[in-house]
Amino acid sequence: MDKNSVNKDSEEKDERHKIEVVDDTNPDFITADSELTQDLPDDVEVIDLVHLKIKSLEDLNLYRFKNLKQLCLRQNLIESISEVEVLPHDKIVDLDFYDNKIKHISSNVNKLTKLTSLDLSFNKIKHIKNLENLTDLENLYFVQNSISKIENLSTLKSLKNLELGGNKVHSIEPDSFEGLSNLEEIWLGKNSIPRLINLHPLKNLKILSIQSNKLKKIENLEELTNLEELYLSHNFITKIEGLEKNLKLTTLDVTSNKITSLENLNHLSNLTDIWASFNKIDQSFESLGENLSALSRLETIYLEGNPIQLENKTSYRRKLTMNLPPSLQKIDATYIRG
């Protein structure tokens, strides 16, 4: 059989087995990113393209949208954000690149000087850079990246909320928070920070979360006089101390540490919540009551998983109710019956 006969036979088989291709209305993979924005009006102010496997900003033709204020591209496959340069510098205020594959913060981000919110969480970023011109920025999110150093933030005078949980930060440097006097919330959970140091620039800080680190001591918080919520769970702290100046505290979380006694808290008259489950607290109920007697606003206490609870299971709730202030409403997530 010659070559032509083989080809003819093959063509006949192909014809007999020809399959009609039907376009998938819900494809697993978007082959043309440009189609995602082609029907949007040029004057649109908000673009939200989530979980669409977008790889390239260039193909979205973002230069068309001169009035764009918010751009959300969460859960895509974007590696480069240099194309943000084409966004309207005087209009764009909110950029969200949560859960992509970004490794570097492009210098073009620095041109978007009206930004108030920037979310780069769940990416592959190693260095904080190219943000110094974003002086209107109020919210900055870097959760779950590979950042090892808190740096290059000193010009962000408007910053109120900074999230750096789930990174590789090993220490707080002397200049880490320099210039951030308006910062109100900072989230540093799941890093490897060994000490509470160099926090003094944060005069207006209200929430400090530094859970799941390597802390052994509560210290150097005396200048954080506006602090209202302090989250220190899953560390290696052995004693409650160093809170003499933090008189506005309403919530203290020391869950899963190595604390043996609730003490040095009676001066915190605004305290409503003490979370201290899974420590080594074994003091008497009378001692506990004395140490917390002045907390007239205390509403909630968590002590489960401590010797004081494990060794007094039948009388535990009753004795706590008897010895703690009458303002108490909840013990270990269960309300006290009236």
From Swiss-Prot:
The stretch of residues making up the signal peptide is none
Tell me, in a sentence or two, what this protein's role is: Regulator of the mitotic function of yeast type 1 protein phosphatase.
- Provide the alphabetized UniProt keywords: Cell cycle, Cell division, Leucine-rich repeat, Mitosis, Nucleus, Phosphoprotein, Repeat
- Residues in LRR repeats: 43-64, 67-88, 91-113, 114-135, 136-157, 158-179, 182-203, 204-225, 226-247, 248-269, 270-292
Q: Which molecular-function annotations from GO does this UniProt entry contain?
A: protein phosphatase activator activity; protein serine/threonine phosphatase inhibitor activity
Record text on subunit structure and interactions = Interacts with YPI1.
Judging by the UniProt lineage, the source's domain of life is: Eukaryota
Which PROSITE patterns does its entry note?
LRR
The record, for SUPFAM superfamilies, names: L domain-like
Q: Which gene encodes it?
A: SDS22
Q: Positions modified as Phosphoserine?
A: S56
Q: What is this protein called?
A: Protein phosphatase 1 regulatory subunit SDS22
* A GO-annotated cellular component: cytoplasm
Location, primary (coarse class):
nucleus
Provide the protein's localization.
Nucleus
Which Pfam families does the annotation name? LRR_4, LRR_9
Q: Which family does the record assign?
A: Belongs to the SDS22 family.
Name all LRRCT domain ranges: 306-338
Q: Entry's Gene3D superfamilies?
A: Ribonuclease Inhibitor (3.80.10.10)
| Further details from the record | Present with 3870 molecules/cell in log phase SD medium.
Please report the organism this UniProt entry assigns to the protein.
Saccharomyces cerevisiae (strain ATCC 204508 / S288c) (Baker's yeast)
Q: Which GO terms describe its biological process?
A: cell division; chromosome organization; chromosome segregation; maintenance of protein location in nucleus
- The question of whether Metal-binding is a record keyword is answered with no
